């Protein structure tokens, strides 16, 4: 289990136990230590890892990330101007460096989002998407 995941679990525990001030203090420390913004109310599944301690990652508080995902540095997940809803990431997903996942988007299980991809639409299970806007490159076998 990597450091940022443990840090987030502490923030999340404080938040769910209505210790919001302490959760926000820990969040502020995490921004300084890890140069990442992972809000305490965010749901992150067990086994998810952030290599490079999520350096430069920014997430909206209501984004949901499934189990056993790998999220590389510089990833942004959040809202999209003029659209309602936020990203939901399935299980066993790899999100490449500096990818952006924006709006009411679901990333399917066992999928890969390539480095620098801009995801604006749902991604099915078991595929690799790349580009701006992200398009299916191939199946992920």
Q: How should these model regions be labeled?
A:
Residues 1-36, 134-135, 141:
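Terminal amphipathic alpha-helical/low-complexity segments used for targeting or macromolecular assembly
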């Amino acid at each position: 289990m990597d450091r940022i995941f443990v840090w987030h679990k502490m923030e999340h525990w404080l938040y769910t136990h209505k210790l919001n001030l302490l959760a926000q203090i820990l969040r502020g420390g995490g921004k300084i230590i890890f140069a990442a913004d992972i809000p305490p109310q965010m749901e992150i599944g067990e086994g998810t890892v952030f290599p490079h301690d999520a350096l430069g990652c920014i997430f909206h508080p209501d984004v949901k990330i499934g189990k056993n995902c790998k999220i590389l540095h510089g990833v942004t997940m959040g809202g999209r101007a003029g659209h309602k809803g936020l990203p939901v990431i399935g299980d066993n997903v790899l999100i490449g460096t500096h990818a952006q996942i924006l709006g009411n988007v679901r990333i399917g299980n066992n999928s890969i989002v390539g480095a620098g991809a801009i995801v604006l639409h749902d991604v099915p299970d078991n595929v690799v998407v790349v580009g701006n806007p992200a398009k299916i490159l191939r199946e992920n076998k």
